[in-house]
């Protein structure tokens, strides 16, 4: 049986990367929430 997680850098960066987050209003919300919480890493 094939495993479910088959990692690829490009799709990961596109969906969870910083610029990917900045593209949408909700993504920007995520970044701001992580900034407010004081996260060291804001995006993947």
Swiss-Prot record:
Keywords: Ribonucleoprotein, Ribosomal protein. Coiled coil: none annotated. One of its GO terms (biological process) is translation. GO terms for cellular component: ribonucleoprotein complex; ribosome. GO terms for molecular function: structural constituent of ribosome. Residues 1-26 are annotated as: Disordered. PANTHER family: LARGE RIBOSOMAL SUBUNIT PROTEIN BL34M, MITOCHONDRIAL RIBOSOMAL PROTEIN 34 FAMILY MEMBER. Belongs to the bacterial ribosomal protein bL34 family. This is Large ribosomal subunit protein bL34. It comes from Campylobacter fetus subsp. fetus (strain 82-40). The gene is rpmH.
């Amino acid at each position: 049986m094939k495993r479910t997680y088959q990692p690829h850098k490009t799709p990961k960066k596109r969906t969870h990367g910083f610029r990917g987050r900045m593209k949408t209003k909700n993504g920007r919300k995520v970044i701001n929430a992580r900034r407010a919480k004081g996260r060291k890493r804001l995006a993947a």
